[in-house]
């Protein structure tokens, strides 16, 4: 894989070292299959999470452009917004967050606790909207208003999921390949598929580094018909910027996100409780709980290509647990 193409993109060091790749012995015994976990939940800033991988590239670009304000959007309990705000605070930048309430709840925990509480600690400027129906356009409108106030804004898309941001997960694929080289021959990788950047970056990287590994994206907000074009568009954009081909099919499972984005379901909450009780690992009700429910059910239903070792990408999100009480 031509690494020189990846290294030509400016990158701000935020993580510092590879995140752990760990064997989960008790979960493996429970499921009857070797299960490993990539611990992107333990990145070092503001209670961790995978978005730091994307922000390393996006914020480097913002600094290159001379920005003094980061603008992004998401749900009230967005992990991405929390991590963006934390990085802004760390670097002395202003952060403006455009937030929606996607589940329409009036529950105080959801509206004020978890990630939302942390945004206040980071001195984030909060702008509420009824719904993020066209987030790119809404962010641009907000950026124009902020610029008129004398700031130099840089727009970071929902989830950090642009081709540039997704370079963080091409790099993650390199990390995974190196960590697995002398430890385990992976058969499959499972990841939550939402704003699509994490999934697409892994798809490009793993196709060139571990082409025999089956990559499964478990959707957290959309059907396969809605999600697949989003992942493919980013996959092709990433590959184009890296001068690579991207021909791997995109595999998605959409059986585990109902009733909708941000709304807990029984299978997801059972997965959260299972990982906590067996391994002391905290998942969340929005992303990783539902993705782990997919992994567990996928093994039960024999949906994988074979029964070899599987790697679960833990993208973080535990701060949201406090917002979803009493579901937890």
From Swiss-Prot:
Its EC number is 4.4.1.15. Its cofactor is pyridoxal 5'-phosphate. One of its GO terms (biological process) is D-amino acid metabolic process. Gene3D superfamilies: 3.40.50.1100. It comes from the Bacteria. One of its GO terms (molecular function) is D-cysteine desulfhydrase activity. The keyword Signal does not apply. The keyword Lyase applies. It catalyses: D-cysteine + H2O = hydrogen sulfide + pyruvate + NH4(+) + H(+). The modification N6-(pyridoxal phosphate)lysine is found at residue 51. InterPro entries: ACCD_DCysDesulf, D-Cys_desShydrase, D_Cys_desulphydr_bac, TrpB-like_PALP, TrpB-like_PALP_sf. Keywords: Lyase, Pyridoxal phosphate. Belongs to the ACC deaminase/D-cysteine desulfhydrase family. NCBIfam families: ACC_deam_rel (TIGR01275), PRK03910.1-1 (NF003029), PRK03910.1-3 (NF003030), PRK03910.1-5 (NF003032). Catalyzes the alpha,beta-elimination reaction of D-cysteine and of several D-cysteine derivatives. It could be a defense mechanism against D-cysteine. Homodimer. This is D-cysteine desulfhydrase.
